[in-house]
Each structure stands twice: as structure tokens, then as C-alpha cells.
């Protein structure tokens, strides 16, 4: 068995004295592990950092075997990313989200979004916007997507400012007013048709994380006996600190 694909390194762990098991998110083969000979050595260390993009050749005698990777760096961005505190937390959080996906199942849309985030990680606001949308995409990919296209109560497509925590559906201002204390705010940049828009300040970003965080925790993480990673909280805090620093300047 053999295939060639593009991949993003999610993590590594030592295997024996000299080798490493490397976990990739690949474009066409999903989340996939393989053994890298010599991967525990210092020569390979710069290549095998989370967030780097690689060209991967995987070989195994049978498809169900762990197999071996031959990797070649195509975009070695990890060293630059890790100079930003939000990026260091962010890549760890993204890797944790990717591990929610079943192994060896293609998720090419998720791969494309993941790579796009890595290219914009130097700007904390842009990175945070991408990460909120990535969490939305993960909910969709795992079968728990939110329906933000129209009001669950009236069917209207305008003035959608709330989300029902029970149904995950949008609610309009007028329909939601009597129950606004029980509803979640829907940031404008997450509304249907606003895919290219930016958050309106830090509050919008934080409301986005609150929204996705609640549904990820309830529908995905808690049923698996998991909680949000510390890296997620670290990323959100680092983004908030960067906003304070920029405002002070």
C-alpha cells in the first residue's frame, strides 16, 4: 500500500530510541498516523513541529497497518508562529479539535480551513476570527452544525441576533425578545451571508467563542468524557491581551 498527499503536522511522540510516530491532518486521507524513522533525532526536529506543512508518502504492507512516513517540508512556519503567544496556543487547540475527527476519513474542507488559519496566525484578530469559524465547521463536520440561516420561530431571514441553546437555530430580534436572557447572542460576523465579514470588536469575537464553545462542549466533548483544552482558554486570553496592547499603543 502506498499513497502521496499533503499534510499538516498535528503532533509527534517518540517510538523507541530513534523513531517517532507522527500524526498528520492530510488533504485526502484525513487524520492519519505513521512512523518516521529517525524522527526522534535532532535533525528531524525542526520539520516535525506542529503547524508545519509537509508532502507525505505513506507506505505499509496492509492498509490497516501503522505504516511508515517519508516527509518533506513544504511550509515550515512553526518557528515563526511560536514567536506569538496566541499562535502557540492556537495550533495546540486546532490540533485538539482535529483529533475529534475519526482517523483515516477524508475531511478536505477542514484541511483547507486549517491551512488557511495557519497562514494568518500572525494577526491575532484575524486568527481568532478564523478559529471561531473553524469551530463552527467542526460542529458541522461532526454532525452538530448550527442553522443560522433563518429564524426558528418565524422563518424570517433578517435581524437574526440570537441562537437557541436548545436547537442551535437562529432567532430573530422580535421573536427572541421575550426570552433574550435564555438565548445566546449571534455575532454579526457569523450570520448567514456574512462569511467574509470581520468581527465588530473584541466583544464580537468573545461572543463567537462562547457560542461555539457551548455547543462543542455539550454535543461533542462531554459525551466523550472530555472538556475544552487548556490551549483554547490560553488562545482566547492571548487574543484578548493582544487587543489591550494594541489599544494602549
UniProtKB/Swiss-Prot annotation:
PANTHER family xrefs: DNA REPAIR PROTEIN RECO (PTHR33991:SF1)
Designated name of the protein: DNA repair protein RecO
Record-stated family: Belongs to the RecO family.
Highest rank taxon of the organism: Bacteria
Pfam families from the UniProt entry: RecO_C (PF02565), RecO_N (PF11967)
Keywords on record: DNA damage, DNA recombination, DNA repair
Any one Gene Ontology cellular component term annotated for this protein: bacterial nucleoid
Lineage of producing organism: Bacteria, Pseudomonadati, Pseudomonadota, Alphaproteobacteria, Hyphomicrobiales
Naturally occurring in which organism (per UniProt): Afipia carboxidovorans (strain ATCC 49405 / DSM 1227 / KCTC 32145 / OM5) (Oligotropha carboxidovorans)
UniProt-listed GO biological process terms: DNA recombination; double-strand break repair
SUPFAM superfamilies noted in UniProt: ArfGap/RecO-like zinc finger (SSF57863), Nucleic acid-binding proteins (SSF50249)
Annotated function: Involved in DNA repair and RecF pathway recombination.
